[in-house]
Amino acid sequence: MSIQVEKLTKIYGTQRALDEISFEAKQGEILGFLGPNGAGKSTTMKILTGYIPQTSGIAKVCGFDVSTQTMEVKKHIGYLPELNPLYTDMFVKEYLMFSAEVQGLGKDAKSRVDEMIERVGLSLERKKKIGQLSKGYKQRVGLAQAMLHNPKVLILDEPTSGLDPNQVVEIRELIKEIGKDKTVLLSTHIMQEVESMCNRVIIINHGKIVADDNIAALQQQSKHELTIVVEFKNEIKESILKNIEGVKVIKQKGKKYLLKCSADVREQISTISSQQGWVLLSMSLEEDSLESVFQKLTNK
């Protein structure tokens, strides 16, 4: 496994930022690390990159222990933190050459820099100062720097934070391409991010892992509760809908009604509407989104 974490714990004073979390990630996997602010996502990433020590537990990257083999771990990791640290007064290629030299690439530095500039789409920006670039292109510079030494594992903390919609799409596509031959651990609190990029998702809340599965399986967890959206043209008696067996909760939004049900009751609704003289404009069955699963797991 590229990443192995076992009973990882981090304590700040009386606060358990991480509480014995365990997970693994393999090559070719884009693993989404999803959770509300303060859940423990960034803390986990900082431990994996050797930035801060854990209180207890084991974390390994490509078989190397982050506590006792920190330098070996860093050779195998590319890290893009949430606040991308760049020298804004340096030119793009100049900065990447400097980074390559710091990483000890030696005679391979120029070829690797040129390769990364091409791969992340910086060819037209290579002679610009970093401070002149848009946020999206600055993220590309950060990704290029993180991949210069050809690491097996990429750790990306909120990689699309602050980008406009077009930049978000571009960076997501780039990460998906990178993830074909590397292990990518991607932290976010945006559900669409996970759905569009990740093979698997871990949901973390209050320092504990509350879910670890692929997206379809997570959505399947709450299939016992269906949402039926019904819209009527005229006024109806909500109490009649509530009396349908299987209807648990009704929420009204204008002339639309959201019914939380334990079974598919669309046929009963259609029959009752006809009997009561209600004009039924539309009725649809909605699957639980990852967002609804996330809310259920983190609102505890």
Question: PLM features: residue spans?
Answer:
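C-terminal coupling/interaction segments
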Residues: 261-300
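ABC transporter nucleotide-binding domain
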Residues: 170-260
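ABC transporter nucleotide-binding domains
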Residues: 2-5, 10-205, 211
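A generic structural signal for secondary-structure junctions
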Residues: 78, 95, 104, 202, ...
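A short linear hydrophobic-aromatic micro-motif
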Residues: 121, 246-251, 279-284
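Short beta->alpha junction loops/turns
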Residues: 66, 233-234, 262, 286
